[in-house]
Curated annotation (Swiss-Prot):
The lineage of its organism: Eukaryota, Amoebozoa, Evosea, Eumycetozoa, Dictyostelia. A motif ('KMSKS' region) lies at residues 655-659. This is Probable isoleucine--tRNA ligase, mitochondrial. ATP binds at residue 658. Its EC number is 6.1.1.5. It is an enzyme of class 6 (ligase). Keywords: Aminoacyl-tRNA synthetase, ATP-binding, Ligase, Mitochondrion, Nucleotide-binding, Protein biosynthesis, Transit peptide.
Amino acid sequence: MISLNNSFFNKRVIVNSFNNYKRSFGTKSQNEESAIVDSNHSFAHTLNLPKTTFSMKANAATREPTLLKDPYKLYKWQLENNKGENWVFHDGPPYANGDLHMGHALNKILKDIVNRYKVLKGFKVNYIPGWDCHGLPIEQQAFKKLKKSSDMKASDIRKIAGDFARKEIEKQSKGFQEMGILGDWENPYKTLDYGYEVEQIQTFYDMFNKGYIYRGVKPVHWSPSSRTALADAELEYNNNHTSKSIFVKFNVKSLSNHILNNLPTTSDINKAEMVISAIIWTTTPWTIPANQAICVNSEMDYILVKPIESEQYRNEMFIISKERLESLTKSFNIGELKVILEFKGEQLKGTITKHPQYDRESPIITGDHVIEGSGTGLVHTAPGHGVEDFQICQQQYPDLKVLSPVNDLGCFTDEVGEKFVGLEVLGDGNEAVINDLETIGSLLHKEDYIHKYPYDWRTKKPIIIRTTLQWFVGLKNIQKTALQSIERVNMVPPSGSNRLSSMIGKRTDWCISRQRVWGCPIPVLYNCKTNEPLINDESINHIKELFGKFGSDCWFEMSTQQLLPPSLKDQHENFVKGTDTMDVWFDSGTSWRGVLVERGIIDKDTGRADIYLEGSDQHRGWFQSSLLTSVCVRDIEPYKNVVTHGFLLDESGIKMSKSIGNTIVPSTVIKGGPNKVQNPPYGVDLLRTWVASSDYSKDISIGPNILIKILDGIKKIRNTLRFMLASNFDFDPTIHAIPYEKLSSLDKYALHRVFKLQESVTRHYDQFQFQKVHTEIINFSIEISSFYFDVIKRHLYAESPNSHSRRSTQTVLFKMLDVINIALAPITVHTSEDVFLHQYQFKNNGKGLDKNLIENSVFAHGWDQLPSQYENELISNQFTNIIAIRDVVNRVLQSMRSQGIIGRSDETIMELTVTNEESSPFYDNLFAINSQLDDIFCVSNVLLKKFNTFEKDVEQQQQQQQQQQQQQPQQIEPNSKGEFIFNTIISNNSKQLGRIEVLLKISDKFKCPRCWRHTSIENDKVCKPCDSVLNSLK
């Protein structure tokens, strides 16, 4: 039984369409070795042989540059000529450092696909490419050029860094334009632009005025390798970092009353001689000198234990978590630990311990952040080097002077004493602390500990927590508004919403000050006596005016007197300018204002970009910083849609890395490598097709084998396009087009399929589902080629040039080509431009279009919406059934070919016997197109019959045939008359439509020497239809 649905083919037909794909383009095969495309045929001059200069091969490396419309000129043209609404695509700025890599290509091509689609739909696309210009990597380039670090002036570093960034921008810009990226390349934005920095410091001041920005002493992520504070977004985590973990004894100086009063007196416990210690565990031994407390959980159970098998510790007892007893007994490896006393953490309050290395106390305090499962249950607390440590100490000891004895270089200061001063805390200093603890008898145990640890994302080196005076954005008061705003944003994929919300919900402060030279300065001067910041309307307006004229370099080049507002210039000796610069995420995070508002693209109070599209790492980067600054200033999110893509993997699923050597650069894919055999030049369209065909919501693989597969897909589509162009070589739609109502049922069916293609492709583009767009077009090309193209060849080639049926088919092909090419255009930019020029060759009296004119671009043509009348479900259902029958016929013909009975299908004639199920118009639908059945089934003649019953039990025969088909390829044997007969049932959506019997036999007529159909009455004579055409040509 053949079961159908409303798709173009059932599954078997789709599979067959792949096998028969080449046949639809005139490629020689057993069934299609047709003289119709043989120019040496004696009747060739009477045939409408296909012709086109559209090459089978793309020759992309050489031809694409000649086809590409200038991305900037096209961008300007659409802004001036498109009549639709504004579409604001805000570009997340890549770093102005280094050559373009495949991540750049993935990101920019995805953006360009969106923008070019919107241009075709008539929108005015606003897309201003941008670059992130500040930060350490560019500053390091300046260091390399300045020979002596002692001679480095801030102004010298900044000049070299700025020049370097501008050169990198110029290089990257050229590469992006070669990829066909549409945009305002003459006026990109740069975070070092004067106007941009003016808007940035205004945003800083607005947030300060609203109370969101403040200055304070807090623990921050500090990078000794970069010598600056870092934000969360500037960290990456090493899951296999190895730390030295230690268990340290803090001797109890005085116990809490509860424990003291309940301490038992036994023969093995001498209170006078017994030493009680609180045992802490840490993976950062270098922070022990900064310890100022020990934290426990008031609700957890703790125990006092005594080693009873260790001579070394016979006069000692340890305080540890009850839950950790078994694990710690193994770790300490000093024998059994006897439980002496059990108590709650709350009962430890009031206990005072002595710092093992310094003459100071460390009280035991309580905190909810202490949990079971690791360590000892007693947490070493160094408020100068831990966020939670700092918070708990601030709550319980507001006046505590926090110790943070580490300098900008990550070395101990003299606060720790002579034995450690100057040592690197992540190196020799760490070892020195451990050795010292061991020497004084306070080290109970040490071991390596592998865990997740934060690294500087730029230098790839570990960071530390360090308490310093910094500028922060306090997030507690805006978290609710920020989280509510995320709910209004369309996230693609939807999981991005939870991810962004989770990150913002867990964040309390954002450190925005950096101790670097190359960046936008924090526009604040400080009172020399009070250290109070000078920041008010007058000071900010004055600095804005200076930045607007001279750029932020003036902050480092001008005197304090020049930087002070007029009213305070006489007091310049009382002020000093700050040396901090802003976090690069604050730089780029204010781009909604520095670009979109400043250039008048969106309203300053309520305007939002239509879309932000970046890698998934930007949930903790640009997406977040943009949201926070916009919500702080305007109480509104800066974007309507946020689309994220994954990262790049090689063909083995391994992340691409220069150190591994598995990277591929865009230029190699486009232009080829030194060895063109090993790395051939594929061109830009292939790179863009790779992007479009990938599920960008996940990590994406690329490699030689993947590129070859992409190339095969491009060839299929290109052949489809070429067939339509070649078939319409003499078609001018302004003269030859046939009205819809006069088209054949077959042509109407083809238009219905084109309509549905356009409908689905439009939907997928609107939802940013480019992989589905690509799949739809590929499948349509294969499906339409294996059926419609197969059926229409006789009309195209053998009928008279101006016959109704030929012009009807060409009308459909023109519309079909238009829709497919326009649907492809956002992806295969160059190919679509080429097709467009060939399709409209009839323009200007056959001279075609001037390819040098922007208005002759396919993107100026627009996304023509097909008329709704093209959607014809009635005809679609009819042809769905017919195609299923054709599948049956093809299987019978294949049996005849495999047995050597025929070479071509049109050597046969066919009898198609049909029975109708009750209330089914199955036979009537076939009868309505009776005249087209021989073309549809590719045979010389079809005789349609109608009967009520068959002689055989069809259902029983169908079951036998299905069983045979499961075991081996179906082979149909002829009967005694040489006839091939096959019976089956046709059904649609489980509804039985009718039964058919297909009878195929050799035609008793002769082969027509012109069309090769076996319909001639006499040998070597043309058939009647061909004779009529020949007479019309005289």
